[in-house]
Amino acid sequence: RFFRECGVKGVFYNADTEGFGVEQIRYQLLAELNWRPDMTDEEYEALMCELLEKEYGEGWDCVRDYITMWTKAQDTRRTNACWHAIGGNKAMWDNRIDPYYYDTHSGEMISLVEEAIRLASSELQQKRAEMLSCHIYYTTVYTRYYRAEAAGDTALVNTLEGYYATAMDRLRRLGY
């Protein structure tokens, strides 16, 4: 609605439609918004939930809960830089999402995606959830590893290395 009020006629969403997160869902939602720019927040939410259910089956609500948490982690970051591209950051891992949010919530995020994997009723749903899990494990490692290493927290470093190994094992098994 904001873009339309500014005179924008459409949006070219330059992003992958596949991948390890929820890109296909985001892409479909934006396409729907191009055709239905007056969609209410409630209609948008209902459409997102419908798309998530198609992609993830019974575990769709776990993925929706994760998206809420992921959004919060982006909304609470302490800087507006994008992957250090415009500078001004002390720590590269501190600029896309709030790493301190991940300190207290990554365990729940991982539990949510593992539950979505468990609830998958088809091979495709399981693959989608496992691909999403790689994103979640990697983001957890990315946001926490360097600070844990700098603090000498070997227990956390070992846990994070296990997360990384899990993600890499899944990627290999999925053919990546």
Residue ranges and their predicted role:
Residues V11-E18:
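Short acidic/histidine-rich active-site segments
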